[in-house]
Amino acid sequence: MSNIIKQIEQEQLKQNVPSFRPGDTLEVKVWVVEGSKRRLQAFEGVVIAIRNRGLHSAFTLRKVSNGVGVERVFQTHSPVVDSISVKRKGAVRKAKLYYLRERSGKSARIKERLGE
């Protein structure tokens, strides 16, 4: 039974997911349904957490919009997610960047990772 489940999950995995780490700035394009129309909506933010669970993998992005912090969790292999692109690579030393929630302004900046 578990072989069948693994095979089905393997078929549903997306192949075009770029590699990214916490601290990186990503732009995620998501399909949004408004009435009878479908359109792409972009969300750009810093990766503050990654959850690696195969088909159930997810990552959390954070951005500050009009002075308000906005966090959004995306399922990596969801059909709602159209594309993921890495805009900037960040140099951090932790896997979870929840400390950015209490910071604002210059203290919330992340250094850029060079040499990769």
From Swiss-Prot:
Keywords recorded for this protein, A-Z: Ribonucleoprotein, Ribosomal protein
InterPro entries in UniProt: Ribosomal_bL19, Ribosomal_bL19_CS, Ribosomal_bL19_sf, Translation_prot_SH3-like_sf
Keyword tRNA-binding: no
Taxonomy, superkingdom: Bacteria
Pfam families (alphabetical): Ribosomal_L19
GO cellular component, one term: cytosolic large ribosomal subunit
GO biological process, one term: translation
MF annotations from Gene Ontology: structural constituent of ribosome
Keyword Ribonucleoprotein among UniProt keywords: yes
Similarity comment: Belongs to the bacterial ribosomal protein bL19 family.
Function description: This protein is located at the 30S-50S ribosomal subunit interface and may play a role in the structure and function of the aminoacyl-tRNA binding site.
HAMAP family in UniProt: Ribosomal_bL19 (MF_00402)
Protein name (database record): Large ribosomal subunit protein bL19
Source organism phylogeny: Bacteria, Pseudomonadati, Pseudomonadota, Gammaproteobacteria, Pasteurellales
